Amino acid sequence: MSSLVTQIDLDKINHSQSTVKDYILLMKPRVMSLVMFTGFVGMWLAPYSVHPFIAVIVLACISLGAGSAGAINMWYDRDIDSLMKRTQKRPLVRGAIEPDEALSFGLITGFFAVFFMALCVNLLASFLLLFTIFYYICIYTIWLKRRSIQNIVIGGVSGALPPVIGYAAVSNTISLESIILFLIIFIWTPPHSWALALFCNDDYKNCKVPMMPTVKGILYTKEQILIYSILLFLVSLMPFFIGMNNFIYLIIAGMLGLVFLYYSGSLFYDTPDNKQAKRLFAYSIFYLFFIFLLLSSTSTISNIS
């Protein structure tokens, strides 16, 4: 009898652990971690000090806001997620979480993220967080994603706002510095996402999402990636020229940008297995992380105390 009870208890524990893991996956933890990092850099570059406790609240609110948007995105996109190999193991597709539960979780999480940002930080940061969640869900997920080949470009606004939120949380303003942080991510998003679309082209065709390669073709997409990569190279150097970062930043950011351009150019000589597209996609993640790490470590602005 005791062994049976023990087995039942173990099953409950395993189920609870599985449920927690599924809810974490529902919030897109990889996206959350990148969003939290860029939000932190935005805070770090603001020319004011902030109490570490408030900094933790800001990062928690930004992360939960991103998780909220991710959860509602999975709720809305569960039909097409089931058609794509890349997303077939998501919690709603597997039936691990019910759609109503996912929607409720996303709405509640988003509410508390915005509420505590307003209560503990300031209204500007709270409004920007609310706008980011709204934009990702309503403008990108519901309106653009299934209708426009510019879905990633226009929809990229939401992904580029976290450092602006972080900056506003500390300074209660939007400045040229935070706008440049926004532009770096905004211009980075299309080549990053279109590189993914190149080697997931069949998936997007199956679910009829109008990504650039499926609508305009592979060659046109590669040309657009190269154009945006050139723009990214130029914008990434702006922090030095406005006195935001030092000469070390200029040198290293320039080198990172040249490598980005190399990978973008190599797409025109890609093999049928899309090896170069996969390399560009992987490098683009490293690039954004390292650029923002560089922005914080070579800053000429006094920051968090």
UniProtKB/Swiss-Prot annotation:
Classification via Pfam families: UbiA
Keyword Transferase attached: yes
Question: Topology relative to the membrane, per the entry?
Answer: Multi-pass membrane protein
Q: Give the main EC class.
A: transferase
Q: Give the reaction(s) catalysed.
A: heme b + (2E,6E)-farnesyl diphosphate + H2O = Fe(II)-heme o + diphosphate
Keywords on this record? Cell inner membrane, Cell membrane, Heme biosynthesis, Membrane, Transferase, Transmembrane, Transmembrane helix
Transmembrane annotation, as ranges: 31-51, 52-72, 102-119, 123-145, 151-171, 179-199, 218-238, 240-260, 281-301
Q: Which PROSITE patterns match?
A: UBIA
Q: In which pathway does it act?
A: Porphyrin-containing compound metabolism; heme O biosynthesis; heme O from protoheme: step 1/1
Q: Where in the cell is it found?
A: Cell inner membrane
Gene Ontology molecular functions = protoheme IX farnesyltransferase activity
Cellular compartments per GO CC: plasma membrane
Q: Name one GO biological process term.
A: heme O biosynthetic process
Q: Which domain of life is it from?
A: Bacteria
Query: InterPro entries, from UniProt?
Result: Protohaem_IX_farnesylTrfase (IPR006369), UbiA_prenyltransferase (IPR000537), UbiA_prenylTrfase_CS (IPR030470), UbiA_sf (IPR044878)
Q: What is its EC number?
A: 2.5.1.141
PANTHER family for the chain: 4-HYDROXYBENZOATE SOLANESYLTRANSFERASE, PROTOHEME IX FARNESYLTRANSFERASE, MITOCHONDRIAL
Q: In the UniProt entry for this protein, what further remark is given in the free-text comments?
A: Carbon 2 of the heme B porphyrin ring is defined according to the Fischer nomenclature.
Family, according to the entry, reads as follows: Belongs to the UbiA prenyltransferase family. Protoheme IX farnesyltransferase subfamily.
> What is the documented function of this protein?
Converts heme B (protoheme IX) to heme O by substitution of the vinyl group on carbon 2 of heme B porphyrin ring with a hydroxyethyl farnesyl side group.
Q: What protein name does the entry list? A: Protoheme IX farnesyltransferase
